[in-house]
Amino acid sequence: MGSSSLLSFSLCLLLLCHLSQAQFGSSQESPFQSPRRSVSSRNECRIERLNALEPTRTVRSEAGVTDYFDEDNEQFRCAGVSTIRRVIEPRGLLLPSMSNAPRLVYIVQGRGIVGLVMPGCPETFQSFQRSEREEGERHRWSRDEHQKVYQFQEGDVLAVPNGFAYWCYNNGENPVVAITVLDTSNDANQLDRSHRQFLLAGRQEQGRQRYGREGSIKENILRGFSTELLAAAFGVNMELARKLQCRDDTRGEIVRAENGLQVLRPSGMEEEEREEGRSINGFEETYCSMKIKQNIGDPRRADVFNPRGGRITTLNSEKLPILRFIQMSAERVVLYRNAMVSPHWNINAHSIMYCTGGRGRVEVADDRGETVFDGELRQGQLLIVPQNFAMLERAGSEGFQLVSIKTSDRAMVSTIVGKTSALRGMPVEVLMNSYRLSRDEARRVKLTRGDEVAIFTPRRESRAEA
């Protein structure tokens, strides 16, 4: 009897471990693989020329603007992603919706609050109305329960799995600017390779193409049900059911909350303390309490720092475990005037680079050794660099800041020159014979950059150091 109980317990524990690994990814997976990428995208990367991209379609709402990049562009088809930029005005509410693809959202500017509804998780936040103005209704609406609400600020990365309801609100004094990259080639998306947004509220015009026809109207999903059955499902009358369908709502997907949005949320200090005290071993951080954001704009979080060159901050699934679930990661690069990033390539991911400030010169080379991009990337522009394409970036006189969203949760980079680089790891005689160099020349190629890693100071400063 005792051995039977022990066997049952062991089987249950084994099943739990298996499900945990299936849900969030096994820690033993090779970092060189991107197992949740669609194979169909591999035939669409025969690109002869890359271009700096800007939005091609704009949709205006009551309290903001949504800009869409052309997902049919060959660069987006190669990477298997779709990209959106939103500007949310103060007191603007991005209405609840969900998408067919997982996404990463980078906050370029502003602050606010965001809600991500985890299916099946309890409403753990309870708020009570205490204002005298509402005291008369206290007994009718004394308490509201909802899932956790997060505060976000400039430099935050938000991870949103596909199919999860998501909303955000600008409670600051300045517009919120956010760039969103959706991985439409992720195996979690079992529809087509296009981004599909499913509105839970409101209705939205599809917008006007910068060079093309006007779009149609997108209704929310409740509009697709009959009013009668919808009323029965919610247990409300027909009039209220019609309001849920937003038949005459012309405000768009970003609406203005005239009286603000009063929801319960932890203070920034409380939220930070809670996150610092939480283990990330995959068992103690449960599905319902999973952390969905982290800041990569704070200089104190930099992984690479050069006091005269700049800094690089990476965010992967080791730091934010939910990224293992959506198979994406992010990188923030800040270059000072005339500084450079070492020539490098992405080993296991495509890179969607968005310039958040300044400007810089970028060069990209393909597998034939051809230059597929040689130009300037300015604030608000986007460049997609396919996997293994080599790139080189140099800041202009204003500096150069960019964020890269990558299609692997543990994206890896190989630098060509500098400390820990490909050439640094080769014997001098290999370099001599490969490039027909003298021994002295080979040593200079290998060692001139000294201990600089990934970010190089302007050349004249390097000479001064020497």
Curated annotation (Swiss-Prot):
InterPro entries: 11S_seedstore_pln, Cupin_1, RmlC-like_jellyroll, RmlC_Cupin_sf, Seed_Storage-Functional. GO terms for molecular function: nutrient reservoir activity. Transmembrane segments: none annotated. Endosperm of the seeds. One of its GO terms (biological process) is seed maturation. Seed storage protein. One of its GO terms (cellular component) is extraorganismal space. The gene is COS-1. SUPFAM superfamilies: RmlC-like cupins. This is Cocosin 1. Disulfide bonds join C45-C78, C121-C288. Belongs to the 11S seed storage protein (globulins) family. Keywords: Disulfide bond, Seed storage protein, Signal, Storage protein. Hexamer; each subunit is composed of an acidic and a basic chain derived from a single precursor and linked by a disulfide bond. Residues 50-242, 294-443 form the Cupin type-1 domain. Residues 1-22 form the signal peptide. Pfam families: Cupin_1 (PF00190).
